[in-house]
Structures are given as C-alpha cells and as structure tokens.
C-alpha cells in the first residue's frame, strides 16, 4: 500500500486542505489506498458517512453528510454516480418546464465545449466559453453547492467501467469524474485520468514507477495497438 500511495501521488497531488467523504466500503483496496492512506500521507482530512441503524439509513445520511463535510474529492462507482444524476434531474424537473429546458440547453453547450476532455475548449469550441461560464454561474455552480456542498473538484471512479455519457455529464456540471484502472493485487491503482490530463473513455496514464506490457497467451510482448493480457511489475504488486 505504501508504494501505491507514492505512485498515486505521482498522478494526483492532494493539498493538505482537501477533505474527502468516504462512502465506499473500507474493506476495499480502492478505498484504502486512494481514500484513507493517500489523504493521510498528504495531511488532508477524511470523514465517513454516519452508518445509522440500517443500510437505508446509511444511504439517507449521504446527502446530509455531504453538506456537513463539503468534500473536495469523492470516490465513486458507476451505480452511485447514476443515482446522484437521477436525484439531480428529478429535482430539476420538479422546478418546472422552463428550468428543465434551461438545464438541458446548458448541458448541450457544455458537452460541445468539453469535447472528449483532452480537446476541451480548443478550436471553434473556445467560442462557447462565455456561454458555458454563464450557465455555470446561473445553474451548475448552484447544483454543485446544493448536492455536494460547493467544494467538490472531481470524482475518482473505480470498481467498474464508467459509462462515457456519465463522464460527459459530470464534466458538464463542472465536477469531472476521472476513470481509473486497477486490481486488488496491485494495491490497486495502475492508471487514472487526472485534472491535468483526461479523456472520456480512457483509463488514463500509468502511475510511476511501474513497468507495464501487453502480452499474448504465450507471454510474448505485443506491439502497441494489439489486444492481449496486461502484465505489470512494481512494488505495488502483492
């Protein structure tokens, strides 16, 4: 775990003033490395959701604790991310047709401006920047405060493949969800997108130091672009 914390820090540096609210199981290596140890290593603060007397009470406590902690980073899995979106859009629709149309138009512009992530605001997209900024001031910043406390910078997603549409959606809200890739046996982080470099649908860039190659069934290394089995070597491998 110590090695993987140092490797993860090569991708995303966590300022000491950052806070995280952990609502993923603590017995998972993803929560251990990225949620607990990385924050401890950087002197940042962490909080957990009030468990309550049942699973349902635990889920009801999440929105309450988000407002109390006002986290800067959240760890998520696709099911939770979809549930957040469902609740956000239900709240928008409850405010009436005009608000919903305004919201949908803002999403459409942000999708165009963000592109695939790594081409955000480039070329003709720069013309959309004033409108994207306006919609952020009028709507999306308020949603971030109302739902997540107002300080959230980004999510780190793991546990399963993140739908590209879900990544586009949260980027449009101003809180991108960075997909990563890992294995429990690798402690678990192997790669991740980062605030400085991300692309929707990609699993990001490798942690450092770590060796990686793609091999065929016989263990022969394959050239770039070929599909095969992922082999890694590093101090994070159990």
Task: List the model feature ranges, each with a label.
Residues 2-19, 23-140:
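Conserved AMP-binding/adenylation subdomain of ANL enzymes
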Residues 111, 128-238:
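Conserved AMP-binding/adenylate-forming
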């Amino acid at each position: 775990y110590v090695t993987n914390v140092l490797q993860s820090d090569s991708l995303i540096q966590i300022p000491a003033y950052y806070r995280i609210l952990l609502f993923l199981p603590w017995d998972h290596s993803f929560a251990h490395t990225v949620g607990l140890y990385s924050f401890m290593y950087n002197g940042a603060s962490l909080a957990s959701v009030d468990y309550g007397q049942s699973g349902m009470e635990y889920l009801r406590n999440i929105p309450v604790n988000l407002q109390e902690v006002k986290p800067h980073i959240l760890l998520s899995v696709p099911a939770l991310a979809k549930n957040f979106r469902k609740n956000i859009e239900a709240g928008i629709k409850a405010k009436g047709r005009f608000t919903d149309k305004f919201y949908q138009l803002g999403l459409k512009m942000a999708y165009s401006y963000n592109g695939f992530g790594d081409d955000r605001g480039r070329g003709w997209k720069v013309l959309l920047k004033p409108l994207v900024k306006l919609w952020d001031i009028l709507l999306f910043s308020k949603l971030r405060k109302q739902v997540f406390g107002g300080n959230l910078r980004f999510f780190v997603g793991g546990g399963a493949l993140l739908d590209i549409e879900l990544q586009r959606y949260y980027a449009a809200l101003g809180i991108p969800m960075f997909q990563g890739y890992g294995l429990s046996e690798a402690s678990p982080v192997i790669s991740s997108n980062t605030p400085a470099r991300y692309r929707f649908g990609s699993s990001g860039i490798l942690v450092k130091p770590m060796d990686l190659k793609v091999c065929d069934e016989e263990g022969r290394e394959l050239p770039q672009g070929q599909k095969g089995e992922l082999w890694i070597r590093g101090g994070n491998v159990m």
